[in-house]
Swiss-Prot record:
Entry's Gene Ontology cellular component terms: alphav-beta3 integrin-IGF-1-IGF1R complex; exocytic vesicle; extracellular space
GO biological process: cell population proliferation; hyperosmotic salinity response; insulin-like growth factor receptor signaling pathway; negative regulation of apoptotic process; negative regulation of P-type sodium:potassium-exchanging transporter activity; negative regulation of release of cytochrome c from mitochondria; negative regulation of smooth muscle cell apoptotic process; positive regulation of cell population proliferation
Sequence segments annotated as region (A): 91-111
Annotated region (D), positions in chain: 112-119
Source species, domain of life: Eukaryota
Protein name per its UniProtKB record: Insulin-like growth factor 1
Bias type Basic and acidic residues, positions: 126-139
Known role: The insulin-like growth factors, isolated from plasma, are structurally and functionally related to insulin but have a much higher growth-promoting activity. May be a physiological regulator of [1-14C]-2-deoxy-D-glucose (2DG) transport and glycogen synthesis in osteoblasts. Stimulates glucose transport in bone-derived osteoblastic (PyMS) cells and is effective at much lower concentrations than insulin, not only regarding glycogen and DNA synthesis but also with regard to enhancing glucose uptake. May play a role in synapse maturation.
Family matches, as InterPro entries: IGF-I, Insulin-like, Insulin-like_growth_factor, Insulin-like_sf, Insulin_CS, Insulin_family
Region: B, residue numbers: 50-78
Amino acid sequence: MGKISSLPTQLFKCCFCDFLKQVKMPITSSSHLFYLALCLLAFTSSATAGPETLCGAELVDALQFVCGDRGFYFNKPTGYGSSSRRAPQTGIVDECCFRSCDLRRLEMYCAPLKPAKSARSVRAQRHTDMPKAQKEVHLKNTSRGSAGNKNYRM
């Protein structure tokens, strides 16, 4: 999966390509220079801007996108850097809503992958699986006890 560019970065690339096409013309007007300055400003503001925070529905959407079918936790599952001392537990909201977080931080809250179910062989199914009707008959016969079909009067 490729790196996702921010909107200002994409805008700069588009502006810069357009400007280079226009520079080939011998006349450079002040509007062209203004256009270039605007593009440079957009690029530098995107370079200095830090990661954004995710809260509420945006946080849930981001987790669903990153984790997919695995699902996710709002608190870190046990075993993620837990020490012997009980530290105050922080969750995804503390890490990504109150502070900014990156993709790796979001991935830490994904549920583990479930192992793929292995296909059982046909031979194993023949010997272990009985049709439902046979199971019911088998259960009826075993529930009579050791007396069989004999009726005892008392």
